[in-house]
Curated annotation (Swiss-Prot):
Source organism superkingdom: Eukaryota
Catalysed reactions, as listed in the record: L-cysteinyl-[protein] + hexadecanoyl-CoA = S-hexadecanoyl-L-cysteinyl-[protein] + CoA; L-cysteinyl-[protein] + tetradecanoyl-CoA = S-tetradecanoyl-L-cysteinyl-[protein] + CoA; L-cysteinyl-[protein] + octadecanoyl-CoA = S-octadecanoyl-L-cysteinyl-[protein] + CoA
Organism lineage string: Eukaryota, Metazoa, Chordata, Craniata, Vertebrata
Protein's gene: Zdhhc3
Ranges for domain DHHC: 128-254
InterPro entries tied to this protein: Palmitoyltrfase_DHHC (IPR001594), PFA4/ZDH16/20/ERF2-like (IPR039859)
Active site: C157
Lipidated positions per record (S-palmitoyl cysteine): C146
Protein name, per record: Palmitoyltransferase ZDHHC3
Biological process annotations from GO: lipoprotein localization to membrane; positive regulation of receptor localization to synapse; positive regulation of synaptic transmission, GABAergic; positive regulation of toll-like receptor 9 signaling pathway; protein localization to photoreceptor outer segment; protein localization to plasma membrane; protein targeting; protein targeting to membrane
Main location: Golgi
Function in brief: Golgi-localized palmitoyltransferase that catalyzes the addition of palmitate onto various protein substrates. Has no stringent fatty acid selectivity and in addition to palmitate can also transfer onto target proteins myristate from tetradecanoyl-CoA and stearate from octadecanoyl-CoA. Plays an important role in G protein-coupled receptor signaling pathways involving GNAQ and potentially other heterotrimeric G proteins by regulating their dynamic association with the plasma membrane.
Length: 299
């Protein structure tokens, strides 16, 4: 009877052709600290530009159609501050999600010398990606757009032109949250402005002509409703993924769980940082993810 090995082979293991030094070039020297990460993908760049354009369009309508023409100065100042603060945090989160290395595995380190340096014991295996010639840590997956293996890759999002992974998931969650909040805020203001225009003379409720005002408000309403639904679903999906400590790819592939199960609170702290603070809501605070080894090669 044929015995099934107790360990699971994924892309590689100990196959002679994969361990030849000439098959994998030595890994490149790491760039200087703070080097910006940016994916040169036409679709992703276009989606990122559209995202900024839509936020700036909402900013234009809120300020120049609804708030500045209003005679209620307290209403205009309070809503202007709130909306601009949320928009600023949303765009800052978008930049951090887009320009932060999501957790790329060093490229080209699957050399014979490096594998031998791991000093594998009998029964231990390492996974290799034949596409980028990297030794894959546990829970890493290859992204065909980024052309790299990404640690704890959840998915590749064209709207941030980047993968959502171990190092930038916090910023992606904040981006979806702040976009949902400014969308809700914009919808509420559009509703109040329509009521105000119906009660007052349409020529006095905006500095634009009535037809132009209606078109601008309807477009903003449609945009805000669409983004509110989309980002709310994405936010809920991401929070659920964090709490269960299971990425979107792992859920789709129904991969066998080989990592330790932790509480929901510990999983949240692993993404947003230790300990809990207002920095969780800030795209400028880099999370301290503790002392976990990000390169767990051997399983």
């Amino acid at each position: 009877m044929m015995l099934i090995p107790t360990h699971h082979f994924r892309d590689i293991e100990r196959k002679p052709e994969y361990l030849q030094p000439e098959k994998c070039a030595p890994p490149p020297f790491p760039g200087p600290v703070g080097t910006m990460w940016f994916i040169r993908d036409g679709c992703g760049i276009a989606c990122a530009i559209v995202t900024w354009f839509l936020v700036l369009y909402a900013e234009f309508v809120v300020l120049f159609v609804m708030l500045i023409p209003s005679r209620d100065y307290a209403y205009s100042i309070i809503n202007g501050i709130v909306f601009n603060l949320l928009a600023f945090l949303a765009l800052a989160s978008h930049c951090r999600a887009m320009l932060t290395d999501p957790g790329a595995v060093p490229k080209g380190n699957a050399t014979k010398e490096f594998i031998e340096s791991l000093q594998l014991k009998p029964g231990q295996v390492v996974y290799k990606c034949p596409k980028c010639c990297s030794i894959k840590p546990d829970r890493a997956h290859h992204c065909s757009v980024c052309k790299r293996c990404i640690r704890k890759m959840d998915h590749h999002c064209p709207w941030v032109n980047n993968c959502v992974g171990e190092n930038n998931q916090k910023y992606f969650v904040l981006f979806t949250m702040y976009i949902a909040l400014i969308s809700l805020h914009a919808l509420i203001m559009v509703g109040f402005h329509f009521l105000h225009c119906f009660e007052e003379d349409w020529t006095k409720c905006s500095s634009f002509s009535p037809p132009t005002t209606v078109i601008l408000l309807i477009l903003l309403c449609f945009e805000a409703l669409l983004f509110l639904i989309f980002t709310s679903v994405m936010f809920g999906t991401q929070v659920h993924s964090i709490c269960t400590d299971e990425t979107g790819i792992e859920q789709l592939k129904k991969e066998e769980r080989r990592w330790a199960k932790k509480t929901k609170w510990m999983n949240m702290k692993a993404v947003f940082g230790h300990p809990f603070s207002l920095g969780w809501a800030s795209p400028f605070a880099t999370p301290d993810q503790g002392k976990a080894d990000p390169y767990q090669y051997v399983v």
